[in-house]
């Protein structure tokens, strides 16, 4: 029997049912994990296209396979669009993820054993910025800068001192859990002082940069890496940007053949579509609502009824799409708070806070993000309602209070249907 044209529902109802269940879960609750977003239907259609069938090792116009005339057009569109979106001279759109984009950049510009300097994972950095068990900590001599114990901000004087002490070949500016903007110009000045390459990992805030509501690192960094989902709202994947032709040549070689073989042209098509969407006025409006929503949430969680329960907002607020909730003085730990919000259909993730006394699987914090709700169309009033629901859930004194909150969450979510074209009957 030829199954080539069988539908998923007909051939594999088990997987189809699980996908449908996930769709209902995403639609009926509030997705507030800061690294998650909703990919537009057009992006998912591009990713689910016949381009998944095509091998295309190499780059547009320089492939090792025949029949690449259409995938060449797809990849060139993605390159041109992302360069225009971020004002970069060169772009590589082939990395399968942000982690592989970072790995390829290091492979291109460093030798094994070279020193790198990045934000400590425990203070908001990322695995690929030098964690010991990650490739970045195994292949390179990883050193770290931290946030200040007084205000939990990156102390640029301390970064400069660490750079002078360790003399890194690469300085990494970027984060996975830090609620403020970074001073890219100062990072570049420090990098120049010690003759280091500055790599900015803007995976979390790329969408804000594209919309013009966050400073761009592109004019300052030697290299900028990013994911294409998160605030950018595209498919899961990575990109690398730069303005130096010599660096661009090294990066292209490091991606292919250095790190990867055949590019995922169906994902690159989805990236191209996402880049086009990110250039639209509606996208800029969405990113502003994303920022405003995070600030509304931070403001609500600093009110007396929350603060008196030992719950605090790290740094007192946010400049980006996420809020870090500090539970070190609260009755709840991070795991308990995550579970409490899950009980009312609000999905967040527990997250370590700087100087966290609890183990990483428990933590003393929450990371709460607004990109997915902004993508669904949530207004300022909606974000105020969400902030009230989160505050009520975190300060609830018994489980009986959670049922009515869950009903309110479901009513709010129902006002914004998700992917109606995908619902199965």
UniProtKB/Swiss-Prot annotation:
Q: Quote the Gene3D superfamilies the UniProt record gives.
A: Aspartate Aminotransferase, domain 1, Type I PLP-dependent aspartate aminotransferase-like (Major domain)
Q: In which pathway does it act?
A: One-carbon metabolism; tetrahydrofolate interconversion; Amino-acid biosynthesis; glycine biosynthesis; glycine from L-serine: step 1/1
Q: Which SUPFAM superfamilies has this protein been placed in?
A: PLP-dependent transferases
| Residues recorded with modification N6-(pyridoxal phosphate)lysine | 230
Reactions catalysed:
(6R)-5,10-methylene-5,6,7,8-tetrahydrofolate + glycine + H2O = (6S)-5,6,7,8-tetrahydrofolate + L-serine
Give the protein's cofactors.
pyridoxal 5'-phosphate
Q: Name one GO molecular function term.
A: pyridoxal phosphate binding
Site entry: Plays an important role in substrate specificity: 229
- Secretion signal span: none
BP-aspect Gene Ontology terms = glycine biosynthetic process from serine; glycine metabolic process; L-serine metabolic process; tetrahydrofolate interconversion; tetrahydrofolate metabolic process
Q: Per its UniProt entry, what is the enzyme's top EC class, as one word? A: transferase
Q: Function, please? A: Catalyzes the reversible interconversion of serine and glycine with tetrahydrofolate (THF) serving as the one-carbon carrier. This reaction serves as the major source of one-carbon groups required for the biosynthesis of purines, thymidylate, methionine, and other important biomolecules. Also exhibits THF-independent aldolase activity toward beta-hydroxyamino acids, producing glycine and aldehydes, via a retro-aldol mechanism. Thus, is able to catalyze the cleavage of L-allo-threonine.
This protein is called: Serine hydroxymethyltransferase 2
């Amino acid at each position: 029997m030829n199954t080539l044209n069988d539908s998923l529902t007909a051939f594999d109802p088990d997987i189809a049912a699980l996908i449908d269940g996930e769709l209902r879960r995403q639609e009926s609750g509030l997705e507030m994990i800061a690294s998650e977003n909703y990919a537009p239907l057009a992006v998912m259609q591009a990713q689910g296209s016949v381009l998944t069938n095509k091998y295309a090792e190499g780059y547009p116009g320089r492939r090792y396979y025949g029949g690449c005339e259409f995938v060449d057009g797809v990849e060139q569109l993605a390159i041109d669009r992302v360069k225009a979106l971020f004002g970069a001279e060169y772009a590589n759109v082939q990395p399968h993820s942000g982690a592989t984009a970072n790995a390829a950049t290091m492979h291109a510009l460093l030798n094994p054993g070279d020193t790198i300097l990045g934000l400590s994972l425990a203070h908001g950095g990322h695995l690929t910025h030098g964690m010991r068990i990650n490739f970045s900590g195994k292949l390179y001599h990883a050193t770290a800068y931290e946030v200040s114990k007084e205000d939990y901000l990156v102390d640029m004087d301390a970064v400069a001192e660490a750079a002078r002490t360790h003399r890194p070949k690469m300085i990494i500016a970027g984060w996975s859990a830090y609620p403020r903007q970074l001073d890219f110009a100062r990072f570049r000045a420090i990098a120049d002082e010690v003759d280091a390459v500055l790599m900015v990992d803007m995976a979390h805030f790329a969408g804000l940069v594209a919309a013009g509501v966050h400073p761009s690192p592109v004019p300052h960094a030697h290299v900028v890496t990013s994911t294409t989902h998160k605030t950018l709202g595209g498919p899961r994947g990575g990109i690398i940007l730069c303005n130096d032709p010599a660096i661009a040549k090294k990066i292209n070689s490091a991606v292919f053949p250095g790190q990867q073989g055949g590019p995922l042209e169906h994902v690159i098509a989805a990236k191209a579509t996402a880049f086009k969407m990110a250039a639209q006025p509606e996208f800029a409006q969405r990113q502003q609502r994303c920022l405003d929503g995070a600030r509304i949430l931070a403001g609500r969680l600093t009110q007396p009824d929350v603060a008196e329960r030992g719950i605090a907002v790290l740094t007192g607020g946010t400049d980006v799409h996420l809020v870090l909730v500090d539970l070190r003085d609260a009755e709840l730990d991070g795991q308990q708070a995550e579970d409490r919000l899950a009980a009312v259909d609000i999905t967040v993730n527990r997250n370590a806070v700087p100087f966290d006394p609890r183990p990483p699987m428990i933590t003393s914090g929450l990371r709460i993000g607004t990109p997915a709700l902004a993508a669904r169309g949530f207004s300022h009033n909606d974000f105020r309602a969400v902030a009230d629901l989160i505050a009520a859930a975190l300060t609830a004194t018994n489980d009986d209070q959670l049922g009515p909150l869950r009903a309110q969450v479901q009513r709010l979510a129902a006002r914004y249907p998700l992917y109606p074209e995908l619902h199965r009957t």
